Curated annotation (Swiss-Prot):
Family: Belongs to the class-II aminoacyl-tRNA synthetase family. Type-1 seryl-tRNA synthetase subfamily.
Transmembrane segments: none
Compartment annotation: Cytoplasm
Primary location: cytoplasm
Residue ranges the record marks as coiled coil: none
Protein name: Serine--tRNA ligase
Gene that this polypeptide is encoded by: serS
Pathway named in the protein's UniProt entry: Aminoacyl-tRNA biosynthesis; selenocysteinyl-tRNA(Sec) biosynthesis; L-seryl-tRNA(Sec) from L-serine and tRNA(Sec): step 1/1
Residues binding L-serine: 231-233, 285, 385
Native source species: Halorhodospira halophila (strain DSM 244 / SL1) (Ectothiorhodospira halophila (strain DSM 244 / SL1))
Oligomeric form and interacting partners: Homodimer. The tRNA molecule binds across the dimer.
GO cellular component: cytoplasm
Length: 425
């Protein structure tokens, strides 16, 4: 949520910033609605004061033995007007609350201008694209050759956009998860957490998935107050919901492995083959909660932590700064990590690392106690995938394949694979 004070003081400036996203914000309409709120607040306060004064007069008149019926009638009229004013104020406040929740975060000035992914800016690349002497197979064909990747079985169980893994591929999937968790906990200073996979609307609103993106979520029919978590960002960031974190405990760094569930409502016809875009997938998620003045350095560090996974696995990748038209609703700045997939001859997203500044914190009422003032202030929150496990598996299969369809195991994963160095032997 954008700072309400900033919104009231400079709605035109907010509108200009949000226009970089292609988002239209009616600053004049907001000013008029906010002025109406202030007028109604003043009116209700005045009427409350009048009611209280007349009530005191009734008590005094009663003691004097005077006729209090005229005063009681006046109090009744004031109460009726007060009720009408309070109803109108509540309606205006609801409109303002809905408007506030519908506004995306303000963009950082370093976010590139642009309309879509074509306008994103490549910041750096790492690793050479493998020069294969044969036409590379995609991960679906490799999975069929190796055995253990079955989309038909998953379709019988659950429908499209699911997969089952078995044998060495299931073990490789688990090895990736364990490797990522160990790396982030042992070397990057994260605390591993376990969280619910079901989340409520309050939590989804706090991180920004609701109310705008409800169509992307799976809702529990038996209990409509709950949703399947679309990303661990939601439950992990909500660990600080309605909390005041003491300065001595800052910053907080959490890592969490969870399944993620997405309806992919807006992705009809996209990536229908394979594991790239599924209803259920797994991620190792990184979340940081930091002091406001530290969040930009924290974004660089968090992005570096995700990059380390790719470097240890020797997977070629690039880092892209998302433009205003492509960046997520809650983010002030986002870096995407994109890994090279030989069969597609293109880079594909494997992680998004974002600084949300105080946007999520205001929705969550997540604060820290500033030691200089002793007062609670909104924290800054960040998150990024470290990494998406299924897409990482895809990248390993395609980048480490041999001409005969066998796949080498990255050196960093050999200990997690019980010493196995080659899939398909």
């Amino acid at each position: 949520m954008i700072d309400p004070k900033l919104l009231r003081n400079d709605p035109e400036g907010v509108a200009a910033n949000l226009a970089r996203r292609g988002f239209e914000f009616d600053a004049a309409g907001y000013r008029a609605l906010d002025a109406r709120r202030r007028d109604l607040q003043q009116e209700t306060q005045t009427l409350q004061n009048q009611r209280n004064e007349r009530s005191k007069e009734i008590g005094a008149a009663k003691k004097r033995g005077e006729d209090i019926e005229p005063l009681k009638a006046e109090v009744g009229r004031i109460a009726e007007r007060l009720s009408e004013a309070e109803t109108a104020l509540n309606e205006v406040q609801e409109q303002l609350d809905e408007l506030h929740l519908g506004l995306p975060n303000l963009l950082d000035e370093q976010v590139p201008d642009g309309q879509d992914e074509e306008d994103n800016r490549v910041l750096r690349q790492w690793g050479g694209i493998p020069a294969l002497s044969f036409k590379p197979r995609d991960h679906v064909d490799l999975g069929e050759l190796l055995g253990g990747m079955d989309f038909e079985a998953a379709a019988r169980i659950a429908g499209s956009r699911f997969v089952t893994l078995s044998g060495p591929l299931a073990r490789l999937h688990r090895a990736l998860t364990q490797f990522m968790l160990d790396l982030h906990c042992r070397e990057h200073g994260y605390t591993e957490v376990y969280v619910p996979y079901l989340v409520n609307a309050r939590s989804l609103t706090g991180t920004g998935q609701l109310p705008k993106f409800e169509d992307d979520l799976f809702r529990v029919e038996h209990d409509p107050s709950l949703y399947l978590a679309p990303t661990a960002e939601v439950p992990v960031t909500n660990l600080v919901q309605e909390r005041i974190v003491e300065d001595a405990d800052m910053p907080l760094r959490f890592v969490c492995h969870t399944p993620c569930f997405r309806s992919e409502a807006g992705s009809y016809g996209k990536d229908t083959r394979g594991m790239i875009r599924q209803h259920q997938f797994e991620k190792v998620e990184l979340v940081q909660v930091v002091r406001p003045g530290e969040s930009w350095d924290a974004l660089e560090a968090l992005t570096g932590h995700a990059e380390t996974v790719l470097r240890r696995l020797a997977l070629p990748y690039r880092v892209v700064s998302l433009c205003g038209g492509d960046i997520g609703f809650s983010a002030a700045r986002t870096y995407d990590l994109e890994v090279w997939l030989p069969a597609q001859e293109r880079y594909r997203e494997i992680s998004s690392c974002s600084n949300f500044t105080d946007f999520q914190a205001r929705r969550l009422q997540a604060r820290w106690r500033n030691p200089e003032t002793g007062k609670p202030e909104p924290v800054h929150t960040l998150n990024g995938s470290g990494l998406a496990v299924g897409r990482c598996l895809v990248a390993i299969l395609e980048n480490y394949q041999e001409a005969d369809g066998r796949v080498n195991v990255p050196e960093a994963l050999v200990p997690y694979m019980g010493g196995q160095r080659l899939l398909g032997d």
